[in-house]
Amino acid sequence: MATFHYHYDPLDRLIQTAGIQRFYNQSRMTTEIKGTQRYSVFQQDGRLLAQQRRDRTKDECHLLGTDLQQSVLHAVGADKHHSMAYNAYGHRPVENGLISLLGFNGERADPVTGHYLLGNGYRAFNPVLMRFNSPDSWSPFGRGGINSYGYCGGEPINRVDRNGHFFGLVSLINILKLSLLRNLRTSFQMC
């Protein structure tokens, strides 16, 4: 039976597992290194933009297409377009491909278990069982909610859980920002 070790930094963020090192900018993962391969994710204002993969022989860049919850739906490279799909709780069949480092809700799936380690590794969410593997330390009477194993109060379409403690609504502010940007672009193009 294989044994895997998970290592955390002083801020309780997952930084190393099974030969993989992770680096963060604030609370979001920016780079992952495994052997000679290095993946870097580029973001702006919380929006995923692109991913770069580098190793000794070549560099690959992919532009990422996401939904409002930051789930990566498309990765467009120089020579190929990849599409990804998930069920409501983030499960993605293996044959669906893993071209992007990040996936459902912009989170990294653990390469060993396929679970999403939310809160930078605080708690593992199992998309097949549609629940967390361990209870929330803030439940049942805190902000974690009554069901200490539940994910997003049973409503993963309109809610997102970034830290493994409690969920929030998909930001109405982000929707308004996108609408405002579209209107500004249209107004600017008319000038």
Model-derived segments and spans:
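A structural detector for short beta-strand units
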Residues: 1-6, 17-24, 36-42, 58-64, ...
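Cationic, amphipathic, low-complexity alpha-helical segments enriched
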Residues: 180-190
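Short turn/helix-capping motifs enriched in Asx and small/polar residues
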Residues: 2-4, 80-83, 87-89, 123, ...
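Beta-turn initiation residues at beta-strand->coil junctions
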Residues: 1, 16-20, 31-36, 50-56, ...
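Short glycine/serine/proline-enriched coil/turn segments at secondary-structure junctions
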Residues: 57, 111-115, 141-143
